[in-house]
Amino acid sequence: EMLKRLVALVLVVFSLSLQGCVSGVGGLKSYADSTDGYRFLYPNGWSEVKVANGPDVVFHDIIKPTENVSVVINPTQGQKTLADLGTPSEVGYKLGKSAIAPPDSGRTAELISAEARELGDQTYYLLEYLVKLPENQERHNIASAIVYRGKLYTFNASTSEARWGKMKDLLTTAAKSFSIDG
């Protein structure tokens, strides 16, 4: 199942991070992938991490490497739109159970919010999670997802719950900046 392939991405996202290209807006830099046709903003001072298998790209904070953003691309099973996969809450719940906190991972994911947003003529789902890890650790994830040309593109930003207050605006802006050139 396409969502299961996100498991590898999220596992990497919990432990990795990213870097930048062009100067951007308010503490953010711009990254564009001309091959896969997506772009997003990420925090200044983050660097790209090369990862085999899983995410298409990962950036993380050099000082706090568990703070990261990543993009995962998975084929869909014939679904042409996000609505074909379900409502924002349904897709958020599925991603939470299959990718962010899969069975036997020791993690649980609580979907805090799920909304659809339009960017140009495309629909994206913005999903926010509180993730509980073993030993009372908590993380906060915000994701943006779109189905485009038979593939599910998922942008995910993650930080510790303790740093969420400080990182919320930057990571939310990064997630909302994720777009497909279509």
Question: PLM ranges: what are they?
Answer:
Residues 1-10:
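Bacterial N-terminal signal peptides that target proteins for export
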Residues 17-20:
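C-terminal motif of bacterial Sec signal peptides marking the signal peptidase cleavage site
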Residues 22-25:
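Bacterial signal peptide processing site
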Residues 29-34, 115-118:
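Short acidic-hydrophobic surface loop/beta-edge motif
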Residues 35-54:
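Proline-anchored loop/turn motifs at beta-strand termini and strand-loop-strand connectors
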Residues 37, 85-90, 161, 165-169:
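Soluble non-cytosolic domains of exported or imported proteins
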Residues 46, 150-182:
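Surface-exposed amphipathic alpha-helical segments
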Residues 49-153:
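Conserved polar/disulfide-associated segments of primarily extracytoplasmic proteins
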